[in-house]
Regions:
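Histidine/acidic residue-rich metal-binding segments in metalloenzymes
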Residues: 1-12, 18-38, 51-67, 88-104
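Short, catalytically relevant binding-site loops at active-site mouths
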Residues: 20-21, 43-46, 75-78
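Active-site metal-binding loops of divalent metal-dependent hydrolases
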Residues: 18, 42, 110-112
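A conserved active-site cap/scaffold subdomain adjacent to cofactor or substrate pockets
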Residues: 66-78, 82
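Histidine/acidic-residue-rich catalytic or RNA/ligand-binding cores of hydrolases
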Residues: 23-31, 48-54, 79-91, 112-129, ...
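Short acidic/histidine-rich active-site segments
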Residues: 73, 101-122
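Mid-to-C-terminal alpha-helical segments outside catalytic/metal-binding sites
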Residues: 123-164
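Conserved, mostly hydrophobic/aromatic
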Residues: 13, 69, 111, 146
């Protein structure tokens, strides 16, 4: 009932804190609608098998439904390896999601709320240029892909989802 009402009102539904079962139920309710879901801060299940990370089939579903997944800046969700450094884990997640679902589903989902433990290289929003420089230095991403990740994809979702 709640999900249907949210869809009627044109609200965006965030599945970041949903269990895999709840996410599946939401995808079923959403059906063929587009621009109505996001995962505001998560990782890729194939890289780190945390149940709150999205599985590859979900990433493809996001692409088919014009949704965005924000990459969380927290190693706990991005890698099964305990490390204080995380730029490479952020990029590894970006790369995996792009390869599975395309660059249009990518967004930033830092979760800089004070309760998480971000990588030492990026501890707050003032350090976002570090990930930007890192992505450009790899020469694996186009300007359009990096700009999409840094905000254009999320803005597009907001405009298409809320702008109705």
């Amino acid at each position: 009932k709640v999900v249907n009402r949210m869809l009627e009102l044109g609200m965006l539904i965030d599945v970041a804190h949903c269990t895999p079962k709840a996410r599946s139920e939401i995808y079923e309710i959403v059906g063929s609608r587009k621009n109505c879901l996001l995962a505001s801060h998560t990782g890729a299940f194939e890289i780190n098998r945390d149940p709150y990370n999205l599985e590859d089939w979900e990433l493809k579903w996001f692409a088919d439904h014009d949704c965005v997944t924000g990459i969380i800046f927290m190693n706990y969700w991005l890698s099964p390896v305990d490390s204080p450094l995380g730029l490479k884990y952020i990029e590894q997640t970006i790369s995996h999601i792009r390869d599975v679902a395309g660059a249009n589903v990518l967004g930033i989902g830092t979760d800089f709320d004070g309760f998480t433990d971000p990588p030492d290289e990026i501890t707050d929003m003032s350090e976002i240029p570090r990930i930007t420089r890192y992505l450009y230095s790899l020469k694996r991403y186009s300007d359009e892909e990096i700009e999409g990740f840094l905000g254009k994809n999320s803005i597009q979702l907001l405009m298409n989802g809320w702008g109705k």
